[in-house]
């Protein structure tokens, strides 16, 4: 059989019919993929899906026959496709599924090594009182009169959370948890909704989750990539309710993140989470949340503070507090903080309020003293050159007067700089201690003006396995 006949035979078997000329031209370079899909052991796949059903969807009334029918329907879907774009999307998604499901989700139901529940036992009550005082001093804006469009949570979240707990244990090298669930592991008084994760293969994982939900429940979920959040993908159900989301980061970034293990799951070091929390308070909507979520924010902040005090040996009775001078250029959207008091590997930090300006500088600087891109962990790059650190501050900037930074933003900018130091384990001791102590004596000042953050451009991209749509 000559090469053309071999290719035609593979395409014919895949489509269940002879290809038309356009289909042949498009699919002739895809024959290796098509062969893998054709030869995929769907009986073993059905067995893995069924085990996932009994492990993570126990209360769902669905028969084996229904699951088998959905699997068969999807793996013959190409026979009913008439548009080349849809056909290519089916090939891409089927290939991803057959090559990744077993090692991504299939392994979650295999026998695992025993693990022993572990926790760090700390008394958070004292720090919760301090957190109350901090939030009171941060309560400097009026409640918003605008009705906020909070995302509605899908009923699928309960099932996905069960999957995520096991996934975090089995894939601890490539997936790490942060947010309310990670704090719940430290302090059982903290409630959580979905499980927030950073991982190195978010797209593959989320597509597999979408297929698992489709085959077991029959429900259609959609993956949406949001342009203004770096490498962020969210899953919505058929009613646009939130199922789960994930940030994707490089393995090199994952390896740098300070982390702790609890119950065989890695969580982002709570000190990193504390610094990001302080940083996010420079967002006006986060300050508005203090009115409606005071107790929830207090217990989370108190937990982060107590862990950081314990783990990083912060002396609360020291009289040393944050001492930074600054210059602000509102017109050019730049802020300079002077860290001369601290023994850092630079003297001042140059904060760009527009990310493109930082990227331009990095591109035209071939040689630096230090450079690191921490992706979604800090939402910025850091470059050090000639005793100056350059970085991008992604939040709004709050002013207390026409030309004075608000204390909340000074703390936020300092936290952003400290993220570099704590993650790279360089020179953070004095600055971290001073910041924590300064939180306890923040001057309560009204917000005079808000400098907006930069606007991100781009298009939402979507993956819809039901409609055979893949937009990269």
From Swiss-Prot:
Known role: Polymerase that creates the 3'-poly(A) tail of mRNA's.
Swiss-Prot/TrEMBL catalytic activity: RNA(n) + ATP = RNA(n)-3'-adenine ribonucleotide + diphosphate
Recorded superkingdom: Viruses
Alphabetical keyword list: ATP-binding, mRNA processing, Nucleotide-binding, Transcription, Transferase
EC number: 2.7.7.19
Subunit structure: Heterodimer of a large (catalytic) subunit and a small (regulatory) subunit.
GO molecular function: ATP binding; poly(A) RNA polymerase activity
An individual GO BP term: mRNA processing
Family membership: Belongs to the poxviridae poly(A) polymerase catalytic subunit family.
Protein's organism: Canarypox virus (CNPV)
InterPro entries given in the database record: PolyA_pol_cat_Poxvir, PolyA_pol_cat_sf, PolyA_pol_nucTrfase_Poxvir, PolyA_pol_nucTrfase_sf_Poxvir, Poxvirus_polyA_pol_cat_C, Poxvirus_polyA_pol_cat_N, Poxvirus_polyA_pol_cat_N_sf
Name recorded for this polypeptide: Poly(A) polymerase catalytic subunit
Gene3D superfamilies for this protein: Poxvirus poly(A) polymerase, N domain, Poxvirus poly(A) polymerase, nucleotidyltransferase domain
Active site: 194, 196
